[in-house]
Amino acid sequence: SHYSEGPGQNLPFSVQNKXRLLGMM
């Protein structure tokens, strides 16, 4: 199930996480 998403979804997710951290700061 999760493998279906692939690393492609992980990449954007990481970027969003970084932006979230920056926004919080």
Curated annotation (Swiss-Prot):
Localization, per the record, is: Mitochondrion inner membrane
Name the membrane topology term.
Single-pass membrane protein
> What pathway does this protein act in?
Energy metabolism; oxidative phosphorylation
Please, which domain of life does this record's source organism belong to? Answer: Eukaryota
* Sequence intervals crossing the membrane: none
Give the start-end ranges of region Disordered: 1-25
* Any matching Pfam family: COX7C
A GO CC annotation given for this chain = mitochondrial inner membrane
Any one Gene Ontology BP term: mitochondrial electron transport, cytochrome c to oxygen
Keywords (alphabetical) are: Membrane, Mitochondrion, Mitochondrion inner membrane, Oxidoreductase
Q: Which GO terms label this protein's molecular function in UniProt?
A: oxidoreductase activity
- Subunit text: Component of the cytochrome c oxidase (complex IV, CIV), a multisubunit enzyme composed of 14 subunits. The complex is composed of a catalytic core of 3 subunits MT-CO1, MT-CO2 and MT-CO3, encoded in the mitochondrial DNA, and 11 supernumerary subunits COX4I, COX5A, COX5B, COX6A, COX6B, COX6C, COX7A, COX7B, COX7C, COX8 and NDUFA4, which are encoded in the nuclear genome.
Biological role: Component of the cytochrome c oxidase, the last enzyme in the mitochondrial electron transport chain which drives oxidative phosphorylation. The respiratory chain contains 3 multisubunit complexes succinate dehydrogenase (complex II, CII), ubiquinol-cytochrome c oxidoreductase (cytochrome b-c1 complex, complex III, CIII) and cytochrome c oxidase (complex IV, CIV), that cooperate to transfer electrons derived from NADH and succinate to molecular oxygen, creating an electrochemical gradient over the inner membrane that drives transmembrane transport and the ATP synthase.
Similarity comment text for this entry: Belongs to the cytochrome c oxidase VIIc family.
The name of this protein is Cytochrome c oxidase polypeptide VIIc
